[in-house]
A protein has these predicted regions:
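Boundary regions of SH3-family modules and the immediately adjacent low-complexity/disordered segments
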Residues: 37-42, 87-114, 152, 157-214
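SH3/SH3-like (including bacterial SH3b) beta-barrel domains
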Residues: 57-68, 119-136
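SH3/SH3-like beta-barrel superfamily modules
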Residues: 67-96, 132-167
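Active-site-adjacent "subsite" loops/lids of carbohydrate-active enzymes
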Residues: 214-231, 289, 301, 305-353
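Catalytic domains of carbohydrate-active enzymes, especially glycoside hydrolases
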Residues: 236-261, 357-362, 444, 523-530
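Aromatic-lined carbohydrate-binding/catalytic grooves of carbohydrate-active enzymes
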Residues: 246-280, 372-380
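Aromatic-lined carbohydrate-recognition surfaces of secreted/lumenal glycan-active proteins
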Residues: 298-308, 364, 391-430, 489-503, ...
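Substrate-binding cleft of secreted/luminal carbohydrate-active enzymes
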Residues: 442-456, 466-474, 479-551
Length: 551
């Protein structure tokens, strides 16, 4: 009896094992079949040193290129030594394993980059450091990738500081970073130029740059502008009345000209004296700006950058000082140092604030220079320019303009820079202006060749030059400014300041409508056809009425 019971149990056990094996094999086969029908995948991203990744067929023949950063689905059971199978946009491809990343933040595979164009290390718009040409950077990541797989800004480490650098200024090798852009041998022309204590042109950057061209912010083909100082803007209605029956289509309006035109929130945080000394309120300023905008005028916001009495008093460590450490006064004002990146940031913040509050079409930087006539004082140690990065004056000016232009272009706003008429000559001047280094960077270069600023017989002109503004400005534009424009790959629009005030030199000359016409014709006959702006520091209504129809 016991044997029969034991035999029955054995049979049951064998049957149970058999059933388990059948079920197990059935499940395995179903799983296998399911995996063939619907194989397991995981999300990955295409990664590369460059902006493109190659996709292959099963025989490892290249089929197409796709942008770095694109999402794919990796077939987990296909991972091989070199290639893996992925699904992308509903189709199957093979990709090199090294060009697949589990994390989107790791899709940029390059480890080191080199600085082709001297630039700055940024945290937002804050400047952390100046980075010279040829410097090596450790790549830690990026901020964004565009639709073509290109990085906007690389996250890098430099001198133990972490920040971001514009991709346009970086290349893959040390050798490439040391090359100077030499279009048609023009770099050798710059390199041979003399320096007047402002730096060497051969140390500057002349690579082509993308100029502003914004669909939602169209610049007039030719700007014809009146200048409004910080007080005149509050009487915008009167200036509209003056301009309405003329060809005037724009206004240059002070944001800051040593004194702020309105009580800026940026200034309140950084320079309380500037805030307290402001000429008016944001509300009143905005009302007048909107009146101009509603009448169809193109608006240019003017900021005097490195001449700022109140800012220097509030921030003396950022300003030029004498040998005793006291603020140095030049031409009635204190000067923040153009070497100091805190000063750069303050003025850029003012520009960004003005764009947000008032909708300026363009930001114009004036006094983008060091104080003139001070090179002997600097050489003798009488003054301290605060050159913390050991760079030349023109290197500081060019880098500031690159920094500001890059950020303002993100706001779809144009950038212009004012320069002395002397800057069209063939040397780096002592206050840090060199035509090619500035025109190549900004959208508009605005020289100030006021006839009464020239020597009496400049350029061999027999009569006092301010008595014949046509001949003077024709010669200046044709033989100097236009030649400087031809020496760079991406010159700015040349929109020139013209003198709209009477000359008090001997012989005195009234700059009436006829003299305005002579200046304009001289510029345009000499090739400077990008427009003009009237300089009259007091924005005289009577003078503007007199000359409006001559523009």
């Amino acid at each position: 009896m016991k044997k029969k019971v034991k035999l029955r149990y054995d049979r049951i056990a064998i049957f149970a094992v058999f059933c388990f094996l059948v079920v197990f094999l059935f499940i395995k086969s179903i799983t296998f079949l399911f995996s063939k029908i619907n194989p397991k995948t995981e999300k990955y991203f295409l990664a590369s040193i460059s902006n493109k990744v190659n996709l292959y067929d099963k025989n490892k023949n290249k089929i197409k290129e796709e942008n770095r950063g694109q999402e794919v689905f990796l077939y987990v059971d296909t991972i091989k030594d070199e290639y893996s199978k992925v699904k992308y946009q509903g189709k199957n491809y093979y990709v090199k394993n090294e060009e697949l990343s589990k994390e989107y933040s790791d899709v940029v595979l390059i480890k080191d980059l080199y600085v082709r164009t001297a630039t700055v290390l940024l945290d937002g718009i804050s400047v952390l450091n100046y980075i010279p040409k040829g410097s090596k950077l450790e790549v830690l990541g990026f901020d964004e990738i565009d639709n073509n797989g290109n990085v906007f800004n690389y996250k890098v480490k430099y001198n133990n500081q972490v920040g971001y650098v514009n991709k346009e200024y970086l290349v893959g090798s040390k050798e490439e970073s040391l090359i100077n852009y030499d279009q048609n041998g023009n770099y050798l022309i710059h390199k041979a130029r003399t320096s007047s204590y402002g730096g060497n042109a051969g140390d500057l950057d002349f690579y082509p740059r993308q100029k502003g061209n914004f669909q939602n912010n169209k610049m007039p083909d030719k700007v014809r502008a009146l200048y409004l100082n910080g007080e005149a803007i509050y009487e915008a209605k009167d200036y509209i009345e003056i301009a309405k029956d003329s060809q005037i289509n724009a206004f240059v309006i002070n944001i800051k000209d040593d004194v702020l035109s309105y009580k800026s929130g940026v200034a309140k945080e950084i320079s309380l004296r500037s805030y307290n000394n402001a000429l008016g309120s944001i509300e009143k300023y905005k009302q007048n700006i909107e009146l101009l905008k509603n009448n169809g005028y193109y608006l240019i916001g003017r900021i005097s950058v490195f001449k700022d009495y109140a800012y220097a008093l509030d921030n003396p460590n950022n300003a030029i000082t004498d040998k005793n450490g006291d603020l140095y006064k030049h031409n009635g004002s204190y000067w923040p140092s153009a070497y100091n990146t805190n000063v750069w940031e303050y003025n850029l913040k003012l520009a960004l604030e003005a764009i947000e509050l008032f909708g300026f079409n363009e930001i114009q930087f004036d006094y983008v220079r060091f104080p003139d006539g001070t090179n002997s004082l600097e050489k003798d140690g009488v003054i301290d320019m605060k050159n913390n990065y050991n760079i030349s004056k023109i290197q500081a000016i060019q880098t500031f303009l690159m920094y500001a232009t890059d950020i303002l272009h993100q706001k779809e706003v144009y950038v212009s820079a004012d320069v002395f008429g002397e800057s069209a000559h063939t040397y780096v001047n002592s206050y840090g202006q060199y035509w090619g280094a500035i025109s190549n960077v900004v959208d508009v270069i605005s020289a100030m060749p006021y006839p009464d600023h020239f020597n009496i017989n400049q350029y061999g002109i027999e009569e006092p030059v301010w008595t014949n503004p046509y001949k003077l400005l024709y010669t200046w534009s044709k033989d100097f400014a236009m030649k400087r424009q031809s020496e760079i790959p991406t010159p700015a629009i040349m929109r020139t300041w013209i003198q709209a005030y009477n000359t008090t030199k001997t012989p005195a000359v009234e700059y009436n409508a006829e003299k305005i016409k002579e200046q304009i014709k001289g510029l345009e006959d000499g090739g400077a056809v990008g427009g003009y702006m009237t300089w009259n520091s007091v924005s005289s209504k009577s003078k503007y009425r007199e000359i409006a129809n001559s523009m």
